[in-house]
C-alpha cells in the first residue's frame, strides 16, 4: 500500500534548521534518486507517523509538493534513541515498476513459547534485503519460531518469500538462534552451591 503525503520544500540543511523544524512539530527529510537534485522537505510529524504505521519503515510513499508528485521508497528513518521520535527521513525516487532493492523487516512469531522453555531467542537480523518491483514489497515477513528449542538456528533460507521476490542477502546467513537463558542457569548453579554448603555445615 502506498500512502500519499503533502510536504513543503525547505531551503537550508543545517543542524539549527533541523532543530527548528522539529520544534514546530515537523520532521525534516530528503528525496534523492536518478535524474533529480536532492529535494529537502519538511512534513508534519503526526502525518508521517500515521504513514509509517501503514507502510512500515521500508515501504512506499507518494510525495506531493510544490515541485509536483513523486513515488518514493523509504530508505532510512532516523529516530531518537530514547524517545523513538522520528528525527529525519530519507526517501529515494522510484521509477514505475522497475525492480529495486530494499530491506524487509522480520516479524518473529511464537517467541513467547521459547520463553516458557527458560530459553532466549537471539536475533542476529531484524530485516532481510530483497529485490522486487515496488508493488510487491511486503510490509514484513514472518518467521515462526514457536516450535524451536535450545540449539536450533534459523537461516534466511528458512524464511518464505513469494516467487515475485528475490532475496539479495546470503541464504545461509543466520537470522536467529535459540539458547538456554544464562541468567537462569547461573541462578541454578548458585542455588546448588548454597544448598551444598548448607549440607556440609549441617553434617
From Swiss-Prot:
Q: Which UniProt keywords apply?
A: Ribonucleoprotein, Ribosomal protein, RNA-binding, rRNA-binding
The ranges of region (Disordered) come to 1-21
What's an example of a GO molecular-function annotation for this chain? 5S rRNA binding
Description of how the protein assembles with itself and partners = Part of the 50S ribosomal subunit; part of the 5S rRNA/L5/L18/L25 subcomplex. Contacts the 5S rRNA. Binds to the 5S rRNA independently of L5 and L18.
**Entry function:** This is one of the proteins that binds to the 5S RNA in the ribosome where it forms part of the central protuberance.
The record's annotation in PANTHER family points to: RIBOSOMAL PROTEIN L25/GLN-TRNA SYNTHETASE, ANTI-CODON-BINDING DOMAIN-CONTAINING PROTEIN (PTHR33284), RIBOSOMAL PROTEIN L25_GLN-TRNA SYNTHETASE, ANTI-CODON-BINDING DOMAIN-CONTAINING PROTEIN (PTHR33284:SF1)
Please report the name of this protein according to its UniProt entry: Large ribosomal subunit protein bL25
Organism name: Clostridium perfringens (strain 13 / Type A)
Amino acid at each position: 500500500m502506498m500512502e500519499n503525503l503533502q510536504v513543503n520544500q525547505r531551503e537550508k540543511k543545517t543542524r539549527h534548521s533541523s532543530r527548528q523544524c522539529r520544534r514546530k512539530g515537523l520532521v525534516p527529510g530528503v528525496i534523492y534518486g536518478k535524474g533529480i537534485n536532492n529535494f529537502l522537505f519538511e512534513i508534519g510529524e503526526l502525518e508521517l507517523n500515521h504513514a509509517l504505521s501503514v507502510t512500515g519503515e521500508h515501504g512506499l510513499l507518494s510525495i506531493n509538493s510544490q515541485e509536483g508528485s513523486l513515488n518514493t521508497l523509504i530508505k532510512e528513518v532516523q529516530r531518537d534513541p530514547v524517545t523513538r521520535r522520528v528525527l529525519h527521513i530519507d526517501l529515494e525516487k522510484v521509477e514505475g515498476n522497475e525492480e529495486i532493492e530494499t530491506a524487509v523487516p522480520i516479524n518473529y512469531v511464537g517467541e513467547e513459547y521459547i520463553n516458557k522453555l527458560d530459553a532466549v531467542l537471539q536475533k542476529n537480523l531484524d530485516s532481510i534485503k530483497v529485490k522486487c518491483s515496488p508493488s510487491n514489497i511486503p510490509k514484513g515477513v514472518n518467521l515462526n519460531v514457536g516450535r524451536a528449542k535450545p540449539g536450533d538456528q534459523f537461516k534466511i533460507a528458512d524464511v518464505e518469500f513469494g516467487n515475485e521476490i528475490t532475496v539479495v542477502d546470503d541464504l545461509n546467513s543466520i537470522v536467529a538462534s535459540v539458547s538456554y537463558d544464562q541468567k537462569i542457569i547461573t541462578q541454578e548453579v548458585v542455588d546448588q552451591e548454597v544448598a551444598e554448603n548448607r549440607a556440609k555445615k549441617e553434617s
